[in-house]
Amino acid sequence: MKNTLWECIMEKKTFYTPIWFMRQAGRYLPEFREIRKRNPNFIKLCLNPNLVSEITLQPLKRFDLDAAIIFSDILMIPYALGQKIELKKGEGPILEEHDIKEILIVEEADVIEKLKPIYQAIKQVKNKTKKSVIGFTGAPWTLLVYILNKKSPKKNFDFNFITQDKLLVNKLIEKLVEMITFHIIKQIEAGADIIQVFDSWAGLLPKKELPNYCFDPTLEILQRVKKFGVPVICFPRGIKESYSDFCSTVKPGCISIDYNV
């Protein structure tokens, strides 16, 4: 359903400002916490279409929001590429050591098969709401950080260490661009009206490296999915004054900003 949020992003006239929250489905809701108690494995929860659909729609039963954003996680692509992921309380996600060369040869069909429950959940949500449905993904740089750092970089991150093998890093970025594109397309085919791309750790990049690792890979993805006519919201979190450069280079349908702006 292309409602007010979609119309606003497409620069059409609207009669009010549409609202949705990035974390609108999740831990602040007691009904979500009840489901979480019964489903301690977070990845398995994200791959249960019935529960994903239920969790996605929970906020809309409480608030008159303008969109339902699919309950999922940006790390579903690293999972589909073969990395085991564990969420540790107080630490966040921990990714197992994995041979990057094995990640580079994973086929599209294998990734899509593993992520199929997400697309099934989108179809279910579409059948249950007239609101815009937002699908999402992590951006190449942020996923690369998790894959190579093997945990949240919030407390421990070394850009030079992560990018020391430039050839390997560039190949991994290319692989992630490819897989993210497929993931977006499948979400669109399942019924997503809008796509959000989260580059949660873009702010870790030195300013001079933003074009190589943030702007250009995201632009490549947007160019590949442009033909589907679905607007894309981008969130290169933490890049401060470089938001204007991002917008002029990538030209997203909409931009999310953070408290540093």
Where are these regions (language model features)?
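Short low-complexity stretches enriched in small and charged residues
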Residues: 19-28, 91-94, 210, 231-234
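N-terminal basic, low-complexity leaders that serve as flexible interaction/assembly modules and, when applicable
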Residues: 1-85, 220, 251
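A charged helix-plus-loop insertion that forms the helical arch/lid used to bind
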Residues: 86-99, 153-159
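Beta-hairpin (beta-strand-turn-beta-strand) motif
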Residues: 73-75, 90, 136-138
